[in-house]
């Protein structure tokens, strides 16, 4: 479309210049038309330039996936730079970010409450910290809340108000993260729901208006439907309250895993195979980013079998480990080989 636009514009200019000159009254031969060499050259240059630009773009589109693969194979996953536009300026975020980072960032920047759900150790807390840094806001954190005062604060015996992380974020502005919201008592959601809906809240020290920069992100291991076999002690969250949150599923990110492993694809291949074998064996066990980090740190200190035992198995019952080993694929991987060999002893 861009090329055709250039050609059409050039053709409009070319047409009036292409008229032949008048013929003399008594020539022995008809006069030759004046050749518009300059316009022709201009048109050809426009066409050539357009085609060249399209060719470069086409080549780059084709080559980009291969270039990225070459870089990843030889140097590992490189940090990315993401530009964040706020109301006042533009900031750059450089580093390893989860593939859902930009989505969550846009939601938080737009003052939309977010609920991140995903397995333990998949980076939900890290996403929130990176978002607060990207937006230039303070980060406030609270784990599962089972008592209301841990959100609202309280007046102590000396008559002094004891502030909470939620109170500070609500009054001074910042990103407040409530981790394990599905492990918090349902009364907590009622409080958050009221604060989000009204933009004010009645704390023990009186009514407080929400700061314009107050943002909230919650996280959990379930979708708020209650406890399951893997995650016990979880509450069913109130549907009307949860409806105020944009729900984002956060899974393990392959690029982050590869970065943690220092580009060691054999480690990541083993971790992915181990997770799949856990599911196939119907065993409840978590292998998070932390397992990869331990595996990389310990592999130079111990032999492979001891490293697997300390970094991944971590006291797992031998029967469970055998069930998982039976479901591991038959591929050339030293970690899979050593695990199976260890369990045969």
Task: Tell me what each language-model feature is.
Residues 3-345:
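C-terminal regulatory/interaction module of P-loop NTP-utilizing enzymes
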């Amino acid at each position: 479309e861009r090329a055709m636009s250039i050609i059409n514009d050039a053709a409009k200019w070319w047409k009036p210049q292409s008229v032949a000159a008048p013929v003399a009254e008594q020539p022995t031969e008809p006069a030759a038309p004046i050749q518009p060499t300059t316009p022709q050259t201009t048109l050809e240059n426009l066409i050539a330039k357009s085609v060249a630009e399209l060719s470069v773009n086409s080549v780059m589109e084709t080559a980009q996936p291969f270039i990225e693969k070459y870089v990843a194979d030889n140097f590992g996953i490189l940090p990315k730079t993401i530009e964040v536009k706020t109301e006042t300026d533009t900031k750059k975020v450089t580093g390893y970010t989860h593939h859902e980072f930009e989505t969550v960032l846009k939601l938080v920047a737009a003052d939309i409450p977010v609920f991140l759900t995903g397995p333990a150790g998949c980076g939900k807390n890290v996403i929130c910290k990176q978002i607060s840094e990207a937006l230039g806001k303070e980060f406030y954190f609270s784990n599962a809340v089972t008592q209301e005062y841990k959100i609202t604060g309280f007046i102590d015996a000396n008559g002094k108000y004891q502030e909470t992380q939620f109170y500070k974020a609500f009054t001074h502005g910042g990103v407040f993260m409530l981790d394990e919201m599905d492990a918090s008592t349902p009364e907590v959601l009622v409080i958050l729901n009221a604060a989000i809906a009204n933009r004010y809240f009645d704390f023990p020290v009186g009514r407080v208006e929400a700061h314009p920069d107050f943002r909230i992100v919650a996280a959990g291991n379930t979708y708020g439907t209650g406890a399951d076999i893997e995650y016990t002690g979880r509450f069913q969250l109130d549907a009307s309250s949860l409806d105020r949150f944009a729900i984002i599923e956060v899974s393990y990110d392959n690029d982050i895993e590869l970065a943690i492993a220092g580009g060691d694809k054999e480690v990541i291949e083993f971790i992915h195979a181990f997770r799949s074998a856990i599911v196939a064996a119907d065993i409840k066990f978590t292998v998070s980013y932390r397992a990869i980090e331990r595996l990389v740190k310990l592999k130079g200190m111990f032999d492979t079998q001891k490293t697997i035992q300390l970094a991944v198995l971590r006291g797992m019952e031998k029967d469970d480990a055998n069930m998982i080993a039976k479901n591991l694929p038959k591929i050339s991987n030293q970690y899979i080989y050593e695990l199976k060999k260890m369990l045969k002893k």
